[in-house]
Swiss-Prot record:
Cofactor note: Can act both with Mn(2+) and Mg(2+) as cofactor in vitro, but Mn(2+) is the preferred cofactor in vivo.
Name of the protein in question: DNA-directed primase/polymerase protein
Biological process according to GO: error-prone translesion synthesis; mitochondrial DNA repair; mitochondrial DNA replication; R-loop processing; replication fork processing; response to UV; translesion synthesis
Subcellular location, record wording: Nucleus; Mitochondrion matrix; Chromosome
Main location, first listed in the record: nucleus
Cited InterPro entries: PRIMPOL
Species this chain originates from: Danio rerio (Zebrafish)
Enzyme Commission number(s) of this protein: 2.7.7.102, 2.7.7.7
Stated family: Belongs to the eukaryotic-type primase small subunit family.
Motif Zinc knuckle motif boundaries: 390-423
Recorded name of the encoding gene: primpol
Amino acid sequence: MTGGKWQDRVKSVEQRASSFQSSPLSCPYKPRLSQPWQPSSIWRLFPRQNAAIAFAQHIKQDVHIFSLEKEGSDAGQRIFLVTSYSELWHYYSTHRHSLMHCYEVILEGAVCKLYFDLEFHKASNKNLDGKMMVAKLIQYVCEKLEEVYGLHCSAKDVLDLDSSTSDKFSHHLIFMLPNAAFKDNSHVGRFIHDILHPALTNLKKSNPEAPGENRDDVEGTQAKRRKTEENDLGFLTVKNEKGQEQLFVDLGVYTKNRNFRLYKSSKLGKNAAFIVAEDNKFVPNPSKQITKDERIFLASLITNVSFTGQRILTYDMTQKSTAGSECPTLERESHSSDLLGDQKTSPFKEVDEFVLTLVCKDGIQGSIRRWNYFACEQLLVYDIEKFRWCHNVKRFHKSNNIIIVVDLKEEVWYQKCHDPECRRQNYRSSSFPLPQEVCMSHLLMEDEEDQAYLTDELGNIELAVTAPAESTSTTPSEDTEGWGDWPDDPAYLRALQEVEEEEEDEDEEVPDELLLQAVNECE
């Protein structure tokens, strides 16, 4: 081989190496699940929460949003993961190092479970019995659920998770309400705020700077009842590290798109992960395909609520100003309709407008009475009023309203009904396609920054390796232009194998002298 040919070969190899760097032959790592009942693989990482939410809401697969704190990153900096419950658990239980600081994103407007975040500083509260406080709180909340909603529950319906350390008592409580769930976590927050108002009032008296509301004094039996509850809820008052009094219950975990730490996860820089508490009485339903540990994990997820026609609980307080103070007055539904909620627009304004076109026609001005968003299944359920056309009976119902269900994943809508006979039949109309301008896939726009993170085969989360700016701006060479992702041609593979076998048979070696000469010429 001459020196010129050697230089040509070196140049060819360098060109191929550059081409492979900019267009790798291997695809990015995609996790795979082996069981037939498990969903197809979706594992996407985003640097921004809104990008993750947009992606999750715009694809058909059954996915959910989680946030991750990465070792070595700045405090408060999080990466957002979009995947299915099954896939997260599969890698969550095997790649503990990269997924050990994981949080569920409780989406704004999503139907959810009743939940609590409880904690106190042990050194400042040496006389307190945390287990007793948890038991008394569960009993009190169960009493209020029966009083307000007529729901019967007990400690057996409450998953109790513990991440306490020698310094801090820390528990999460997740209520599995029988055939019921809350409209979203803002309604959960209002319900908890109101039932704990006696404790807040008591705290306000001893600590004027403590958070709470001022209410007008109520005369008669109601005032006495409030006074009794203030005394009964005295166990909820704890002291922080500075000795200041505060509530045992964290009232700040009911904000929109709240990140709530997962079962078996710890905070960044900490080692105390949530485990099942010693006093936990909740036992998940058995399943042949799912282990007990995974069933606990699924039960712990706040928005893991499927649309089954269960009661959707709301809790609204109308603000009234009296002598400069706010007087929240409870407004709750007196009936047990399956579809309760706010009359404001849903998180999907375009879908709301489309549904209105379905019920405002033929001279009838229908309207959306209520809506509920089931994030677990990507379903928007609209309770319609004034428009009663039913596809089942092919006419307008005389007194019963209809339900419009929009499936954001499948990009279809269908009709259900409040009519007793239609409900007995469990009637559901045929599915009708959503207009393209309403479909989430049509609205999805991704940018390069959304591809900033990848997961390797060991579960490590790293920044994606991007090609240099020069390679992205240059025109593809004639040799590589038109390369695609299709499989290699079988005839090409056979020919390549024959050439390689011929080269092995010839067993020709380049003399050392010629190699040294080529190297010297290159230098």
